[in-house]
């Protein structure tokens, strides 16, 4: 086996090829300069890409066979800022550079960058901005109120040298110049002199973008090609050597090619004016000076794309100017409209790919979750989770002894079992694998044990893939900034066992060993973010520029960590706002990975069209309403998820019996049938088709109401009390005996207003004025106007539209962003006002909800409908009782 193949097989890392290189300080000094720089460039780009993508290894083939690491040194000229993230080691005939992730907090910038290619004028010189200065410049341009460094002027206030600019302008408009004429002004922050090079076009391409970028990013100015930069003598280019038409085309193409980044919504390039000034030697035309007037650019002008790289599809790719600039200035998302969510980890203090992590203020923080689920005990190896490893030890004879034998080499740490770490990470499970266990121990590199029926190359590759994915997620999602490697190790169980080949164990530098308990706990906290973290629906609903990660509750995580292979059927009773639909989608993803099935093998069933369309957009499974389900056969379906099941009916047949039959028909075992419901939110008095409560087994309850602010949640509890006192006749009383009393913290969140006895006109004005006030205060235009009776939408639509339009138009001139759309239904997400019936809005949510309730309309399910309506609101709930 070659060293390259051996490296790929043994290291669970993103490995980038650094090409061939001569190593050694003296040896590289003796190399051809161009060749030396090229080798350095290839290696630097690979290192940069790994820094921005979670780390990895750069492999370099050593060209000089007599190279000795201890004697010769390395000699590579890598950027100083990169060196703190690098370790080096020989591996046979390869030189390995171990790259840890870029540390955003330590470097103060989001991305590792070789060169920003963003220039500015520093006195009379053109200089490239280092990444930190480039970030400050971008922030100043984005918001002129932000002041720069003491040595860097605010772009909006920097004075222009009027005298120099006037003289430069006079020269630019001169009818002709004299050969060797000495100009009466010097280079300045707004004037640049350049001599023509022997190759006119090539010289322009190399030097002009830097000059134009620097001037455009300042206050504008002039570049004169053909003027000596020290003596100020006019030289020009001899007329025989210049073709003005061709050179004009070269200059135009050069400037048009320069990348720009706009904050202002425009898309124009750098504006300039070009003239060729005639230069005379006495009376004869000698040549030309090329004069370029550069206008000040509104935002940021790059000489070329930044020299910054990332890993995409396992290959290094350059970042575009747009991607680089937008990621550099990326900040934590504004979730002021969600006061119940608090930031735990800022994206500005972690790694380049990580996102801001939010937790619910009444849930455990990451540190507490880590101590509960992954405790680190001194002087012992802790096995966890108890339910998982005991289940595995009971099912697989010899597994306990195998694990205990392996742990004899370690005195302290934590061994985390999983039925499949692949599934936990969003990968497909390998059927031959019994389980995985992750060991994190002080003074060692973490080890991922893959226990399988036999050792083979397929299981080895599987273990490698899982270990590599885990490492990447710990860094890129969990935000772990330290040095990290994970060693994959396959352990066969039973008669196929063989002695482990230690050659399979990759070697990491000593700096990759965990030294302290604090390091172990920091990694475990990143692991908590991976296992408990999910992408909340508000990312897409509100089109947030920066994505966020939210954390599951204990109850939600308990459901998601259920072993689907053993628990194929489940009834999940969840209170309003407990995350039922989000969990249903996550269960769909887990089914696909556990059973290696496709989207068309999984069916999601709900009662209303709006929720169905919402799920269809996710493109993770089939989604239909109950009525459609009863009309079709679904031959490919193996697994079924039912959501909002309390609102199902039996008028079209026994849906539960049909779903049960579909999931039981496979020869290789039953499929998954998970049913989510909330009896509190039932919207009819008919038979739901659900089994009797005593037959709904196994049953799991979600009692934490997490969606809404405190005042709204308190209101929901009051309504639930009314429902318990007066339950609908088709709801079992014992099903309503769930819930919990919540204790509010000092900062009570959520806004609740109840208004009575409004007519249609007053109601329309009330809604429009409240929306206008909220939007002026900075809240998202994320509004639903919900009606307890669908027929009332038609009565109110025109009056609501007119009232909203009047208030939007009245302030359009001063605040055009407040002009919003009013729509019926939920065919699209985004910033608009939705008019819908509460029954059709079941399973959905909005930040701001207006509930339109007819006066005197109480029925047997009045409080159920009111609960469903009120629980749609995250932060603002307005109950409006209307006289129709």
Curated annotation (Swiss-Prot):
Keywords: ATP-binding, Differentiation, Nucleotide-binding. InterPro entries: P-loop_NTPase (IPR027417), Poxin-SLFN/SLFN_N (IPR031450), Schlafen (IPR029684), Schlafen_AlbA_2_dom (IPR007421), Schlafen_AlbA_2_dom_sf (IPR038461), SLFN_3-like_DNA/RNA_helicase (IPR018647), SLFN_GTPase-like (IPR048729), UvrD-like_helicase_C (IPR027785). Signal peptide: none annotated. ATP binds at residues 574-581. GO terms for molecular function: ATP binding. One of its GO terms (cellular component) is nucleus. One of its GO terms (biological process) is cell differentiation. May have a role in hematopoietic cell differentiation. Belongs to the Schlafen family. Subgroup III subfamily. This is Schlafen family member 5. The gene is Slfn5.
